[in-house]
């Protein structure tokens, strides 16, 4: 298990409006060790981990994360086992509507690197759904259902920063969100099925050989059996370490907006990080914020620097 930043206390995560009945899976990866990640939704769909290829980190949105190095994680030619998978999703029907969301911290952006994928056709992705890294660093998603298969992509994922990614599917419309903002959509002429007789893969396309591996961290993975509204996706984005924060506000009064601090792994509750120089380029974080620059660009961290929580655990 990899420790990134010492936690000040435990994480609080209040439920979203859609959580109660429609949350089908929620993986926080907070366990200290072991080859399973518990399902915090209460549905009992544990994720199985290949601990030889994926590592745990202790500080992340939701309380923990999985780390994929993009090298060790490459599936061997004769091995179908994924880095992390949820086998119980083979029996889950999501034809009518669903939503998925996660926090990701990519070190690199190889095209078609999987984030969350459920498909029975690992060669052409012709059934099920996928949320993945698109071409040229975009975020991409697809719902496949025979002839009326569709893909959407947009935005620009940031490396060495936390990005909140989400897709919603209503049965006829697919919407893609990056950091709480809709960036692309597609309407289907007829209902496209999102079901597949396959488990859910986290950070990999289950059974796929020679797929581009995801490199970086994945945290706070959630799946709902409904299409979240834009405001609910925004709530999921702002729901970080126990509070629904206004990303444009300044909780600690240090001159840096909450959303900017979250994006770059700073603590929106700690005013002292304004004077720090996180990337060692001679400019304090506050100065970088005012210049519209990344406080992480000067020195790429080997592991993400994550926010510390100052609240107690409530689930």
What are these regions (language model features)?
Residues 68-71, 87-89, 144, 149, ...:
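Extracellular glycan-interaction patches encoded by glycine-rich segments
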Residues 16-74, 123-125, 184, 233-253:
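Extracytoplasmic low-complexity segments
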Residues 25, 232, 238-314:
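Extracellular calcium-associated, cysteine-rich motifs in secreted modular proteins
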Residues 51-54, 178-200:
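Short, solvent-exposed beta-strand-to-loop segments that form ligand-recognition rims
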Residues 161-175:
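Localized edge beta-strand/strand-to-loop motifs within extracellular or lumenal beta-rich domains
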Residues 2-10:
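Sec-dependent signal peptide recognition
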Residues 22-24, 33-38, 73-140, 159, ...:
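Extracellular glycan-recognition modules
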């Amino acid at each position: 298990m990899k420790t990134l930043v010492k936690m000040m206390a435990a994480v609080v995560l209040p439920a979203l409006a859609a959580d109660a009945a429609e949350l089908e899976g929620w993986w926080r990866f907070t366990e200290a060790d072991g080859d399973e990640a518990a399902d915090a939704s209460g549905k009992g769909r544990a994720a199985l981990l290949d601990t030889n290829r994926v590592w745990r980190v202790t500080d992340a949105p939701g309380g923990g994360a999985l780390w994929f190095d993009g090298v060790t994680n490459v599936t061997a030619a004769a091995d179908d086992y994924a880095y992390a998978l949820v086998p119980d999703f083979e029996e889950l029907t999501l034809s009518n509507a669903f939503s998925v969301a996660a926090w990701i911290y990519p070190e690199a952006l190889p095209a078609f690197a999987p984030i969350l994928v459920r498909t029975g056709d690992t060669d052409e992705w012709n059934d099920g759904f996928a949320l993945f890294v698109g071409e040229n660093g975009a975020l991409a998603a697809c719902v496949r259902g025979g002839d009326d298969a569709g893909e959407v992509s947009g935005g620009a994922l940031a490396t060495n920063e936390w990005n909140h990614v989400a897709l919603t599917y209503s049965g006829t419309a697919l919407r893609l969100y990056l950091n709480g903002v809709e960036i692309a959509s597609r309407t289907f002429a007829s209902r496209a099925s999102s079901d597949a007789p396959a488990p859910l893969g986290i950070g990999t396309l289950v059974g796929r050989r020679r797929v581009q591996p995801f490199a970086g961290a994945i945290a706070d993975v959630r799946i709902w059996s409904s299409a979240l509204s834009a405001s609910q996706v925004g709530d999921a984005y702002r729901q970080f370490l126990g509070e629904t924060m206004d990303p444009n506000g300044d909780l600690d009064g240090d001159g840096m907006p909450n959303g900017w601090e979250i994006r770059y792994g700073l603590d929106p509750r700690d005013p002292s990080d304004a004077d720090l120089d996180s990337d060692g380029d001679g400019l304090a974080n506050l100065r970088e914020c005012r210049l519209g620059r990344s406080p992480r660009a000067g020195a790429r961290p080997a592991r993400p620097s994550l926010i510390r929580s100052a609240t107690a655990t409530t689930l």
